[in-house]
Amino acid sequence: MADKAQTWVYTEDYVAESDALAAARAVASELGATPVSSGTGAALRMLAAVAGARAVLEVGTGAGVSGLWLLDGMARDGVLTTIDVESELLGYARRNFAAAGLSSHRTRLIAGRALDVLPRM
């Protein structure tokens, strides 16, 4: 029987990431902003696709890794709104979204605490 740790490694390595995702993941790691795993990202992409999501709200942008996964599963005209308290991270996410070839019209990045921002949405 396979070891549980080996199973997790296989599962995470099984999902292929685009060059843009790999670059965003590297930036996130350099910044200390822990990105979602490939397996979690693939699950987010699948959920967005199955739901036919045209609008998604994300709390905690990081460097944009989870946002890239979500946008990949969303409708081509879908918009990701993402909130992060650290405006510096939003800048990195914006650059990672652009590097992935995404139009700025597909993302809305908001700096602030989610508890302050969400009631106004």
Residue ranges and their predicted role:
Residues 1-121:
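A short alpha-helical cap/connector motif
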